[in-house]
Amino acid sequence: MRQSNMFRHAYVAWPLFNYTDYEGELCDSGVTDTHTTPKISELKTLLTPRFIHFDEWQVFQAYVNLQKTSSNPFYSFAFDALEQYKTQNSNSKIQVLINQVDRGDGRPSFHKIDINDNRSSRNNKRELKIAIANLKIPVEDIERAFRKDREPNVSYERQQTLWKILNEAELQGVELLVLPEVSVPVSWLPFMISHARRHQIALIFGLEHWVCGNKAYNLLVEAFPFRTTGQYKSCLVNMRVKNHYAPEEKRTLEKFRLLPAEPQTDNYFYNLVNWNGIQLSSYNCFELANIEHRSLFKSELDLLIACVWNRDTSYYAHILQSATRDLFCYVVQSNTSQYGGSCVLKPSRTIESEIIKVKGGDNGCILTTKLDISGLRDSQHKSTRGPEDSAFKATPPGYDHERVLKR
């Protein structure tokens, strides 16, 4: 039965492992610790009893890239998965463009990703309903994820909390849900991506440290749903390694003889995504402290997203207030609830700039709001501000107003 692939593929813990030469337990989510690099069987994909989703191919390729010891950077999995999927599925209608931009001036490279959903016109996306998760991430759970003498916390109680947040987001009609850094166990990654595709909700969250050998990978995950030919559900998955590990994070990893997997200076990398006509980029906690990195997409953004686990909320509050005005875009941050600072900001008068700000609580929940994208872009395109433009402040000096037309 295993050789024929004629069984319920939903039981397979990691996507497409049943299409490879892997001989271990397919239902074991601990496959991430095997240090194996399985290869997809062309015969099995040719004779597959079901449709293989694009996001399954991406998650599988991300796993393979983490296990490889080649010089190719981890983020190359996104382009590799796209090209391989198109090769294996000649009839694929995946309308995703990924272009790598290397500025060559010492600044980070980035992927410019364009997701073309035939259901919507780029010019008619007037607002976006988002939610931030107010969720407690104990430090004990973070350490359990990478300590060899502990097991990750994948308890029923933790699962119920996350499920409740996802279900509430669906009930509220949320289009984009943001969760904190290191908020999701590695073994739950396939479920999260599948949920994004099936329910057509974008998810941005931090994955717990993924340990390969003696390296601990702090990964920021983005899942952007779309429909091929306007009707078939699909999903684009982005994952990248944190560019700047926090000093305390490094010290904690070193206590357990682990190395941070942060890239070298010439391999710093980000993503600039155009999804449903909205242009955004995501940052992973301490990356925001780098003034050059957070200004990388000046005049390019409708929305900047930050997934953090951070005690110094005052420091980050100043960074975010600066970012929303300097970049002249909405800023969304999700932090662990015991420290607070989770917020949604817009570039307006101080008294109006905080759309959402929350801290505390024992129960996990979400807070929602709608972002006025058309109003923001209208202000971004104006060189001066008139008395009728009270919803937003004037754009900062040096802002490229013409760039708005190219999104």
Regions found by a protein language model. Give the residues of each.
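Extended repeat-based interaction scaffolds and adjacent low-complexity, acidic/S/T/P-biased segments
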Residues: 1-121, 128
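Cys-nucleophile CN-hydrolase/nitrilase-fold catalytic domain and related Cys-dependent amidase chemistry
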Residues: 156-238, 310-312, 319-321, 325, ...
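Short catalytic-loop micro-motif centered on adjacent basic/acidic residues
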Residues: 176-181, 280-283, 304-306, 332
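Active-site-proximal beta-strand elements of phosphoester/diester hydrolases
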Residues: 127-151, 239-241, 278-287, 305-307
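CN hydrolase (nitrilase-like) catalytic-core segments centered on the catalytic cysteine
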Residues: 1-25, 29, 187-204, 288-394
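C-terminal functional modules of predominantly eukaryotic multidomain proteins
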Residues: 390-407
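Active-site catalytic loop in hydrolytic enzyme cores
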Residues: 84-123, 215-299, 319
